[in-house]
Regions:
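Structured beta-strand-rich core segments of catalytic domains in phosphoester-bond hydrolases
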Residues: 49-140
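N-terminal, active-site-proximal structural segment of metallo-dependent hydrolase catalytic domains
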Residues: 1-66, 77-85
Length: 140
């Protein structure tokens, strides 16, 4: 039986990180204390695709500035633009081409800012369809 050699473009290193929204009243767990360790970890992992949760726009943009090999998609849950927490997806721009992306609200009205069912706040889901530049394979 022949074994197929796995090529590097067949492997997708995917990570997720709940970065916790910036709450300055959180003392030793505040964003300013956590952010450098997070960047160090992400640089050591070097994920091809990274999903984050709870990122406020300044956190999303900070991460974007520190991960220059990546591009991100995602919007804030409070206005569908920049306000509120983001569930952003970062992907390596030299490995993937973005084909499609969107964010929807987990509610009876998924296409607009809304609170669903028994939730206290808006909840969102961001998705992206990426194409591997080397082989044309697609990944959601």
């Amino acid at each position: 039986m022949a074994l197929k050699t796995i090529e590097s473009n067949d492997i997708h290193l995917v990570a997720t990180y709940n970065i916790k929204y910036d709450d300055n009243s959180n003392g030793k767990n505040s964003w300013n204390v956590r952010k450098d360790a997070m960047i160090e970890l992400l640089h050591s992992l070097s994920p091809d695709i990274l999903g984050i949760q709870e990122g406020l726009i300044h956190q999303v943009e900070f991460l974007d500035s520190k991960m220059s090999s990546h591009k991100y998609v995602g919007v804030g849950r409070d206005d569908g633009n920049r306000k509120g927490e983001h569930c952003a997806i970062y992907f390596k721009r030299k490995k993937y081409k973005l084909l499609k992306n969107s964010t929807f609200w987990l509610s009876e009205n998924p296409d607009k800012v809304s609170v669903g069912w028994d939730a206290a706040l808006e909840r969102i889901c961001t998705y992206a369809l990426l194409e591997n530049i080397k082989d044309g394979n697609k990944i959601w």
